[in-house]
């Protein structure tokens, strides 16, 4: 008996929708990263994209525990000397709902061409509406 290896043409990518209202950021991000990679499937193969599409709604209502809303800091750099900018979780959520979730999930995925393909299957929306009703996503409870 030989080891099974999934072929890219044989993989079926399903669509799921997650309501992030009052969910904890890290717990949602780890479950989403697992499903984007396809590790929840029996046909998981490390070098093939076996994951599903994930649509996250109400990302603006995500929460973090403790005082992390003020203490958790996201950094970015412009490339110029002294060009570092720091933003805390609360301000980032107010300006760009869902950006913190995208950054958390991206950090949990592999770095490289396969990881970049996986992150493209994540769709995050701050409100309750999303344009993916034609794909008939199934509700996923976390």
UniProtKB/Swiss-Prot annotation:
The keyword S-adenosyl-L-methionine does not apply. GO terms for molecular function: mRNA binding; structural constituent of ribosome. InterPro entries: Ribosomal_uL13, Ribosomal_uL13_bac-type, Ribosomal_uL13_sf. One of its GO terms (biological process) is negative regulation of translation. Keywords: Ribonucleoprotein, Ribosomal protein. Coiled coil: none annotated. GO terms for cellular component: cytosolic large ribosomal subunit. Part of the 50S ribosomal subunit. This protein is one of the early assembly proteins of the 50S ribosomal subunit, although it is not seen to bind rRNA by itself. It is important during the early stages of 50S assembly. Belongs to the universal ribosomal protein uL13 family. This is Large ribosomal subunit protein uL13. It comes from Acidovorax ebreus (strain TPSY) (Diaphorobacter sp. (strain TPSY)). The lineage of its organism: Bacteria, Pseudomonadati, Pseudomonadota, Betaproteobacteria, Burkholderiales.
């Amino acid at each position: 008996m030989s080891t099974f290896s999934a072929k890219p043409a044989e993989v079926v990518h399903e669509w799921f929708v997650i309501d992030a209202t009052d969910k904890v950021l890290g717990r949602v991000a780890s479950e989403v990263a697992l499903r984007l990679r396809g590790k929840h499937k029996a046909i998981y193969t490390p070098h093939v994209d076996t994951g599903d599409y994930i649509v996250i709604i109400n990302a603006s209502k995500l929460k973090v525990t403790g005082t992390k809303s003020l203490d958790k800091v996201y950094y970015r750099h412009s490339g110029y000397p002294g060009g570092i900018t720091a933003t805390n979780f609360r301000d980032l959520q107010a300006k760009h709902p869902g950006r913190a979730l995208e950054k958390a999930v991206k950090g949990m995925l592999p770095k490289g061409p396969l990881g970049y393909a996986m992150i493209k299957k994540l769709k995050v929306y701050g409100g309750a509406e999303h344009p993916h009703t034609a794909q008939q996503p199934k509700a996923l409870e976390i």
